[in-house]
Each structure stands twice: as C-alpha cells, then as structure tokens.
C-alpha cells in the first residue's frame, strides 16, 4: 500500500497536485464519507430521487447514463443541482474504450454531453496511451469550459470473475497514468497499485486515488460473476473510495443502507490512518 494511504483525507487534500482530487478529499472529509453509490437505475426520476435521498451520506454518485430510457436536459440540470445541494461529485462510468478521435467526440459532444455534468470519467487503456492523451487534450484545451473541474480514472482492475485486467495490463495502466498526472486522478482497482511494477518513475508527491467497486455487506457475489467485498476489506487493501450499487439502491431502505456503508467505510478509513 502506498504511504499516502496512511495520511488523512485532509492532509492529502492540502498537498495533492491535482485540483479535482483535492476537491474530492475535501468533500470526503467534510461529509465523513468515502461512499460512492452506483445508481444503476433506468429513468431520470429514479436517478434524481436516489441522488436526493442518498446525497447527504455519499461523496460521489456513479452513473451509467446510457441505461436511462429518458435522458434529457432535465437529467443534466437535476444532477448538477443535487450535486450542489448535497456537496457530492458525479462520476460517469462510461468506460471509454476507442481511438482518441472517437472518445473526444463521445466525451465533449455527442448525445450524452458527458463533459457538461460529470466531474469524473473513466477509461480502459486497451486502445493504448492515445485514449488518455485524447481525453486529457480535450479537458485541458484553452476553450474547454470546465478546466480543472474534470478528471479521469483509469480502469486498472475489475472485480468480475475471470477479469483479464491483470498483470501487464495493470502495469500499463500505471505507466500511462504517470504520464498525465494533471488529468488522471487515479484508478478503479481492487487495491492500491503503489507496488505494481512500472517503467515510469513516480513523480515526487505522487498520490493516485483508488476507487474500488463491488463493495457489498450482504452478498459475496452474483450469478453473473461479480465478486463482492466488505468496506473493511476494500479499504484495508488501499481503496480510498468504496463503490456500492445494489447493496445500497436495492436495499429495503436505501437511506439506511447508505448510512450503514458511510459508517463502516469511515470507521475502516479511520482505522487505516490510525485515528481514534
């Protein structure tokens, strides 16, 4: 685990070179939450209702915007308003995976207009470094209106059974991330990647943020190969933010479930940094 994982969120916010990462840690510290809820619902009404009800207890809401049957300006305006109201960030789990020219258009234009409302996006590096270069180029262009309010997570590992995102692919994810520190926030991975072999030397003060998916208190997996872990095990392996979907939104009482994940995630974080 990276030595940065032993620092508090507030300490990392003060020293982090990436402005969006600083904002992310500030939100976590202010709300005492490292929870990302994966709101995998299929209508704008359901999405905005969940965001409003769960907003006080989460640091980030993660969307799969292309599963909405009625995406519109109402979706964008509603998400942005609720992010302001409840002080959370929006992560669109688009998993960009195409040539650079295509992903630039998917991100900043296109039907979903992702750059307008998603603070955080993610991508696979299967297409090579060009995908990250292209997204960074778009976000850092002089005429890009959102500037430092946008950032990228590289999908370095997955929690599904039989995932091929391992070994040299994960190492390449670290290599590429180190070339774009002003845009790449960190990784979606099952652990801290500080010890992964890399051909790129780490920069002084390097502090990649780790989001870990598949966190569930009531299940160990599903019939489609998803493998779950607890907040304690995820944070113990280096996660800075835990992602839970069905464990929260499909619970009998999603608000109470969100509170439970918030409490357990925060207690696991305090144990990791040695706080009382």
From Swiss-Prot:
Tell me what reaction this enzyme catalyses.
Answer: orotidine 5'-phosphate + H(+) = UMP + CO2
A matching Pfam family? OMPdecase
Q: Where does substrate bind?
A: 40, 62-64, 93-102, 228, 246
Keywords associated with the record? Decarboxylase, Lyase, Pyrimidine biosynthesis
Set out the biological process GO terms recorded for this chain's protein. 'de novo' pyrimidine nucleobase biosynthetic process; 'de novo' UMP biosynthetic process
Cited PANTHER family: OROTIDINE 5'-PHOSPHATE DECARBOXYLASE
What's the protein name?
Orotidine 5'-phosphate decarboxylase
Native organism is: Penicillium camembertii
